[in-house]
Amino acid sequence: MVQFDVEKTLEELTLGEKVALTAGTDFWHTAAVPRLNIPSLRMSDGPNGVRGTRFFNGTRAACFPCSTALGATWDTELLYEVGRLMAEESIAKGSHIILGPTINTQRSPLGGRGFESFAEDGVLSGLLAGNYCKGLQDKGVAATLKHFVCNDQEHERLAVDSIVTMRAMREIYLMPFHLAMRLCKTACVMTAYNKINGTHVSENKQIITDILRKEWGWDGLVMSDWFGTYSTSDAINAGLDLEMPGPTRWRGTALAHAVSSNKAFEYVLDERVRNVLNLHNFVEPLGIPENAPEEALNRPEDQALLRRAAAESVVLMKNEDNILPLKKEKSILVIGPNAKTAAYCGGGSASLDAYYTVAPFDGVKAKSEGEVSFSQGVYSYNELPVLGPLLKTEEGEKGFKFRVYNEPSSNPNRELLDELRLENSLGFLMDYKHPKVTSFLFYADMEGYFTPEEDGIYDFGVTVQGTGKLYIDGELVVDNSKNQRQGTAFFGNATVEEKGSKELKAGQTYKVVVEFGSAPTSDLDMRGVVVFGPGGFRFGAARRVGQEELISKAAELASQADQVVIFAGLTSEWETEGHDRDHMDLPAGSDEMISRVLDANPNAVVVIQSGTPVTMPWAHKTKALLQAWFGGNECGNGIADVLYGDVNPSAKLPLSFPVRLQDNPSYLNFRSERGRVLYGEDVYVGYRYYEKVDLAPLFPFGHGLSYTTFSRSDLSLATVPEKRQLEDGEPITATVTVTNTGDVAGAEVVQLWIVPPPTGVNRPVRELKGFAKVFLNPGESKTVEIVVEKKLATSWWDEQREKWASEKGTYKVLVTGTGDEVLKSSFEVEKTRFWLGL
């Protein structure tokens, strides 16, 4: 790659070449113009790891903790380090552009992609995202802020019209992007799928051009979300530079015709192409060649950072009687559905095939010096656990054979085209390719051998984007080939799981065959669904066992145990792109299991893994509770580090945890109704609502305990004289002394809140405006400084003037952290002023 003289290159490009540069060629690559030595660029998801170019059977990758986990760290320096490692992973995958971070706002706990964003508050989200992007771009990799903007639900996400006031848009939903851009002008921005007040974002000139480009002075590349372009000239004229993925639906000959008919002027097309060429120049120093090979890193130092991030994200919610940390020398009973399952990431574009994963049970076992025992307690899968890892090939290797044909099994003379050995019986074939498979229509037989460890009735399940039949020793057990029912798997492209059962004997080996037909063989009605590739399959199995039997056994064992830890929560089955959750509850049986184990042993520790809030009807019973999110590769080790005190918990909640779903401010206005969703809570999202109506959540935003204690003292404020025009350069500097008053080294998060004076508009009781994290040894004191621009600390969006308003009056400053201690001060705004820009 070479640096381009952008203006000279624009003059040399033909109309056809310009048009080609404004759309991708496939799922992950931009167009090349060999005549002018313009190469193709590669991009990759994304939110918590760099998958590379393949969903199916691709190169493994590092999996970082999910974004709500990283949000819980409140650690801007850590996020910078995470960004740098993400960049190195990107380079190893030959990718110039990372499709992340996601910084939408979780207006409801039910949002399917809520785990992908950092926080419900724009200041926390924006400052973390800005540092993450700096880490990426300091290494030369292009960051992509997404999804711009109000992409806050999965229900009808391509079509839903988000009806939102401009005040809420500015103060809540644009704020993470606003603050991230102040720290790091990212190379790319990705538009949201949805409409805003009647117009799809990808063709919304007010959002893309007026606010992002003109008001904020940003000059990067705007790309669509995948299949989120809905027009030709409208999108080009609004400022959408790049349609993704390819092949194009809306550019190509349609765009050439639009230019020739002056629906889109060529100088406007030149603006779009100019941004594409500027992106080439931004990533050129990376030296990544076209179609670079994809490699794995998995270095010891990377594993250490992932472990640190996982541990630093764990929130200590309760710790009565100092139940934690656990004693390594004592025996321990581990209970629960998440104990031996590494819930390391959410689903959808955030999912990837990790280098390795550490389940919580394995993390505990590695730490404990005493006996470690296990009880299932309850199963919490949404679909039956994947069977692939329990299968063996005919040669005795782990997994199963995947054999591909162009004809169905009814053709005895069909030719075998491809044969792979797979271990995961969850396969998304979006990017499967073979020279002799020339269309989306093909067939595959999956064959492996299963030897159960226990007698019993086993349930088998098959989910397909396509058709599927599962046979045991030649007997048809599951038929998912006709009368299919629409499900949510594979981005909404697949069926529900169809099940069958068979009695099996322990120690006997059974031949398992799944006959699969790709997506064109399905009879599902796919209207209104974005079809991703030629198909997908998932087959699983489990021995049938009653929940009562499992719960009773767990409770009995708990009553006799020295130490007990319960691991429960959600997985990527429950929290995933493509659909929202129906409720906040844990999977069926989990709450009863936790409650009964706590009755049997009140000192049992509860660890919840979820990307977003869940209900906890047993919370009053538990003395010790951790919120552990989806912790990436090292989730099990990170949790164990905190449980045993090798890491002192320092995380704070980035989301409010309501007592029940009905308490959430979006409860009456979540999901699309007749094609629209009303953001009826306006600016009162998350803690802003709970504090305004004086409704206590189960655990508030910013909550988190420690194994040590801290004091905060000596708050002082420094301001500068006001200027006639409000702009950057009027900092408010708060300094506070923080002391570790306990016996354990630890970290404190100092939070700075602003309380506005009474004005002519309703405003939140207080708003977070700054924070800092400080690490202290026992007895150590440090001075912490938090600097906030006065315009950002005081302003609200005035819809009449269409400007930010900083009103005259006395503003209170509150400084909080671990514990109930609040330091107070104030400052004056001498005159009301209005402003625009970053």
Curated annotation (Swiss-Prot):
GO terms of molecular function: beta-glucosidase activity
Residues bearing attached sugar chains per UniProt: 57, 197, 493
Enzyme Commission number(s) from the entry: 3.2.1.21
Reaction catalyzed: Hydrolysis of terminal, non-reducing beta-D-glucosyl residues with release of beta-D-glucose
Subcellular localization, as worded in the UniProt entry: Secreted
InterPro entries given in the database record: Cellulose_deg_GH3 (IPR050288), Fn3-like (IPR026891), Glyco_hydro_3_AS (IPR019800), Glyco_hydro_3_C (IPR002772), Glyco_hydro_3_C_sf (IPR036881), Glyco_hydro_3_N (IPR001764), Glyco_hydro_3_N_sf (IPR036962), Glycoside_hydrolase_SF (IPR017853)
Primary localisation category: secreted
Biological processes, Gene Ontology terms: cellulose catabolic process
Domain PA14: 395-555
Function: Beta-glucosidases are one of a number of cellulolytic enzymes involved in the degradation of cellulosic biomass. Catalyzes the last step releasing glucose from the inhibitory cellobiose.
PANTHER family reported for this sequence: BETA-GLUCOSIDASE, BETA-GLUCOSIDASE-RELATED
Protein name: Probable beta-glucosidase I
Source organism of this protein record: Aspergillus clavatus (strain ATCC 1007 / CBS 513.65 / DSM 816 / NCTC 3887 / NRRL 1 / QM 1276 / 107)
Source organism phylogeny: Eukaryota, Fungi, Dikarya, Ascomycota, Pezizomycotina
